[in-house]
Amino acid sequence: MSTSTATTSVITSNELSLSGHAHGHGHAHQLHQHTHSRLGVGVGVGILSDASLSPIQQGSGGHSGGGNTNSSPLAPNGVPLLTTMHRSPDSPQPELATMTNVNVLDLHTDNSKLYDKEAVFIYETPKVVMPADGGGGNNSDEGHAIDARIAAQMGNQAQQQQQQQQQTEHQPLAKIEFDENQIIRVVGPNGEQQQIISREIINGEHHILSRNEAGEHILTRIVSDPSKLMPNDNAVATAMYNQAQKMNNDHGQAVYQTSPLPLDASVLHYSGGNDSNVIKTEADIYEDHKKHAAAAAAAAGGGSIIYTTSDPNGVNVKQLPHLTVPQKLDPDLYQADKHIDLIYNDGSKTVIYSTTDQKSLEIYSGGDIGSLVSDGQVVVQAGLPYATTTGAGGQPVYIVADGALPAGVEEHLQSGKLNGQTTPIDVSGLSQNEIQGFLLGSHPSSSATVSTTGVVSTTTISHHQQQQQQQQQQQQQQQQQHQQQQQHPGDIVSAAGVGSTGSIVSSAAQQQQQQQLISIKREPEDLRKDPKNGNIAGAATANGPGSVITQKILHVDAPTASEADRPSTPSSSINSTENTESDSQSVSGSESGSPGARTTATLEMYATTGGTQIYLQTSHPSTASGAGGGAGPAGAAGGGGVSMQAQSPSPGPYITANDYGMYTASRLPPGPPPTSTTTFIAEPSYYREYFAPDGQGGYVPASTRSLYGDVDVSVSQPGGVVTYEGRFAGSVPPPATTTVLTSVHHHQQQQQQQQQHQQQQQQQQHHQQQQHHSQDGKSNGGATPLYAKAITAAGLTVDLPSPDSGIGTDAITPRDQTNIQQSFDYTELCQPGTLIDANGSIPVSVNSIQQRTAVHGSQNSPTTSLVDTSTNGSTRSRPWHDFGRQNDADKIQIPKIFTNVGFRYHLESPISSSQRREDDRITYINKGQFYGITLEYVHDAEKPIKNTTVKSVIMLMFREEKSPEDEIKAWQFWHSRQHSVKQRILDADTKNSVGLVGCIEEVSHNAIAVYWNPLESSAKINIAVQCLSTDFSSQKGVKGLPLHVQIDTFEDPRDTAVFHRGYCQIKVFCDKGAERKTRDEERRAAKRKMTATGRKKLDELYHPVTDRSEFYGMQDFAKPPVLFSPAEDMEKVGQLGIGAATGMTFNPLSNGNSNSNSHSSLQSFYGHETDSPDLKGASPFLLHGQKVATPTLKFHNHFPPDMQTDKKDHILDQNMLTSTPLTDFGPPMKRGRMTPPTSERVMLYVRQENEEVYTPLHVVPPTTIGLLNAIENKYKISTTSINNIYRTNKKGITAKIDDDMISFYCNEDIFLLEVQQIEDDLYDVTLTELPNQ
């Protein structure tokens, strides 16, 4: 492939996926006496659009002795045959950023149906019945078909070949072709991916414009006449002659393996005929053999396809005729007037300009196509090779559209059994998962016996009841493999474990290209300190239900060429260090491969029942460095050993030999999977290494993480899931069965296991990694875990983004806190398998879902206990003052609701400019300084409010997830250092509040309640915080503790259910410290901008600066807040009478003492009672540490005071209260009302001339500002539009209204309201006093 920006190549076929079939055994070398190569780019594209999914069976194979070698049924260059086109909702966005005015044809269709036809049929391997006739010789088996080209070459050799093939299963051929317009990807000669950008018809020829991974544009021509070949095309074809591979086995027979290009047709073109737009079909090869005898005569008539073969030197060219069925191109699909004007690269973008109309476009980068799926499609993932034969252990299944079979094939199809049903099966009415179950879920017949090794099969293990049967088959396989290995040490021995009843043998080049096909998106850099070259290999078996999350569907043993016979491709170089002739284990690592040696590389894929992704696992063929490469026999006793190179399993182009390859393990339901030889599934991002999906979209901490080991991890808890990584080495020790559980073991057992690992290290000197202690629950068969590294998740802290940033929906931070939080934890709703938000995008917190494993004494437990301290004996709970330390462990993530409607609150102070987006916004305020809080409401059509007056409780809370006891201790600690017992934590300015209805209630020392009408206008209240953030630090020099200003709004003032909850994170400084802190951060921000050289913009790292702080909407409405009032103050209130002082109802089931009554009264504020046994002793309110009492209240009306109330109702009848003991209270006592003095509120009654009913104006505070706000609330006249307010008394004297007049002379007076407009949007208001009626 040229390295220029524009490369032109030629494909001389409209059938780009055509490949030949070679069925030879004894005379395979005679069949392939010439090496072949297809001219132009190695295309062989076997990827279909959703118009028709038709499988192609390709490849060549050779058979020798008792060992069989079958080529992988890949496209000519190793590309998997089938995939889907549409994007999955879970797949990442394409890296190709901008497409402007693009004309791209056939990238996808807009049809809702999967296929063009109404019915979709699933077939077994089509058994083509052809009589023994014609040039093919006598065919003793009618179920065996021979390609016409092969039959023409074989002559009399066919009979001998067929007799030798009768030793194995018959391998019928069924080539199902598809049109050129179904091709959606081009692959280069070395397996590099080429992304199709456009396909045009120019001068009657197809031109495919593609772009490779290096950003180069390649123009591929598909010609129909060899005379149109360019001069440089022959040079390209000559350069590709060396792609053919030849391997010598012990029998001395020449066996040709498939190369990136097919062997049978080096040049495929059209001969004769005048129509250059002829599409060939392969229908006639399935007709009677009599027609093949007339192939030469048909070729002379015109329109025949000529298969040209030659030797490596380009001489001895032979042409083989073949029949064709001419067809016309669809003129609507391929229009000759389409062309592209300009294509250029702009950084990471590819911009395409065209003069034609824009078409539907879906272009994907890398290997994203392998994971694409849309509704109504059958999921056929990339990397799923389809077998060319029917193996003894299972039935390969193909899915084709109705009518996709060529003419002459349908009548030869024989009905078969697929999962107990006769094929073909009409699946047009089935769902996607049901069709996928047919496609991937065909099970081996119960009567099938394993007669050969190396047979091809694609077996899906998806039912639990077949485990026992498959284990028996595995034992039989292993015994036969071991025997055959001893008899034929040079043969390729399958090492298929349970979950695969066969193997697919592919060449190294095909395997390498398949790895390149499935590329993964570049993940964040792996910053771990672990060594990267773990030469570990072993067989692990996962036991127990629900232990692993994947199910193995395919196992491939790929024989690779030896060092001497390896093709000289730059991307395919495998260091062969194994000699299958040796049955003894080599521990020195110095064994070198002989010219006849082979290396078996394992290719395994995993899928899940009902899932949408398939996981490919294989070795990464690249040059092994150093003399310490793994060495050992391929298949020790037991037949379970698999040799892997010590490279990353990731096949993507971005993965190097020392990088980790990670696959996304999403939407994988837990369940008992089959046991497997090797497992590799890992989460894609670095911070997910310590968490595993819980099966329902959430995440639970992974109890263990296996590194550098071939170990399956099992969770003792049913349904548990573990995410781990696998690394592979080039050597195979004897199979060791290992099961790692999360059960806790004593330190002594861990030391013993560590000693055992050290002994293994001494025996295997080429393994240099230091083995860490691992946990081993029950070792099967007495074997020890092989290089398993367990890492606990509980003690780890990962700094993750929060949902606030928009990019941190996966934010989870494990905490060291181990106490049961009950209902006081922000994550009380975050149980395993439960998501916090409604759309399931925010994972749960770790606090409430860690493994419940008991901690005994002072052991270093691998998991963190959530069991109560009474059962543990010890806890690791942190003291409350330690929360002042701003380390990563203190960062918490609070589930939030993001919406633009409903209640919204703002703190009138700017936010910090140094807070990163992954953290919550924070606001700096000064102690004792009043700051405004604006309460607003935007109409929410989905959740409208019913009442005009709502109650909002503003309180100061701790941000950290403390227990209520710890919060009370912190407030008591602060209160004990104050000069007055009446010192409040949260104060409110009653005079300068706006838009409130009634008076401000002091619920507790750290909470107040206000009433306002959200349907009329917004409200504003000024609050001041009287404590410092550093007041809760245990020592000087520690950063202050962040606090929350939390607002709970109740739709009905009498309701106890929270309608909306919001919070704002603050830090409180003293002596203008907030301003100093803000200035320092601004200077640092300016300095960062001057020196910013990073890849990410600073604006993307930090929250944008705003003039006021918006409250976050919380999801958790159930957690009751902790309200604090000192016990000393409560004793005085209790002496006056608790029932009347609090104005709340008693709990009729309480024990009668004052403490319990007052306790229940405050709980009734939020609708919680303590009569239930499970809440006693753990009250959500716990207002103090020693005695329970009610708070001191200045104003005790818990409901709006606009009801008819006598002014003297606030005078309490002391005799009535003291004469009745509290224990005699039966039903709840009537609530006593207490009205504030007139100095803090004024009521005016006004009406206009055309009105008969007066309108009350609540003037709070009793000032002109309060009057302006009252007029604005009632008459919708803006306060800024009122120029003057006058009062005309009964004597006719008019005067301007001032504060004193309102406070002392206007209470409950009656006025006539007159509004006079003096200018545009400027009014004078006159209140004319009316005589009392």
From Swiss-Prot:
Restricted, during embryogenesis, to tissues derived from ectoderm, predominantly the central nervous system (CNS) and the epidermis. Transmembrane segments: none annotated. Residues 520-532 have a biased composition (Basic and acidic residues). One of its GO terms (molecular function) is DNA-binding transcription factor activity. Residues 899-1125 form the Grh/CP2 DB domain. One of its GO terms (biological process) is chitin-based embryonic cuticle biosynthetic process. Residues 445-488, 533-546, 567-596, 749-772 have a biased composition (Low complexity). Residues 52-93, 439-598, 617-655, 727-784, 853-885 are annotated as: Disordered. Residues 59-68, 626-642 have a biased composition (Gly residues). Keywords: DNA-binding, Nucleus, Transcription, Transcription regulation. It holds the Pfam family GRHL1_C. One of its GO terms (cellular component) is nucleus. Residues 853-877 have a biased composition (Polar residues). PROSITE patterns: GRH_CP2_DB (PS51968). The keyword Nucleus applies. InterPro entries: CP2, TF_CP2-like. It is found in: Nucleus. Belongs to the grh/CP2 family. Grainyhead subfamily. Transcription factor that binds a CNS-specific regulatory element of the Dopa decarboxylase (Ddc) gene. Also interacts with sequences adjacent to other transcription units, including Ultrabithorax (Ubx) and engrailed (en). Activity in vivo may be required only at high levels transiently to activate the expression of Ddc in the CNS. This is Protein grainyhead. The gene is grh.
